[in-house]
Amino acid sequence: MSQWTHVAAIFRLDSFGKISDESIYKAFGKEVTWDDLYNYDESDDTKTLPMGSEGPLEMSIWHNSDEGCMASTTVSAFGDLRDYGGSDIDKLKDWFNDCCKQFMVRQAVMHVIDEYADEPIIVQYVE
């Protein structure tokens, strides 16, 4: 039987000016499609979003249209990771904290449900 881990994370980022999508993908990791998995090259060291056996989390980027607002960007990462749990959760926490270190974070939280754990895990950014 498969082990599933369900993830919902949101990052509210502050900036002076626009944060480029490229810098977000560089910090968070790129999304990988099923075709990318089929042609996956282990020597490729490009950072990816956290990944289970059937693929990674998905990511959505929203930019505030009011360019004068400090709360400029919201990034959400979400999905269901198969064959991922237990000690992998520490890697997920490290990923979350590494993402937060790259930007001025107004607010960030991640809710994780490991189907084999007793309780959900909530990780929040604290400066």
Where are the model-predicted features located?
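Charged interaction segments
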Residues: 23-40, 44-127
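Short, extreme N-terminal segment that most often corresponds to the first beta-strand
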Residues: 1-30
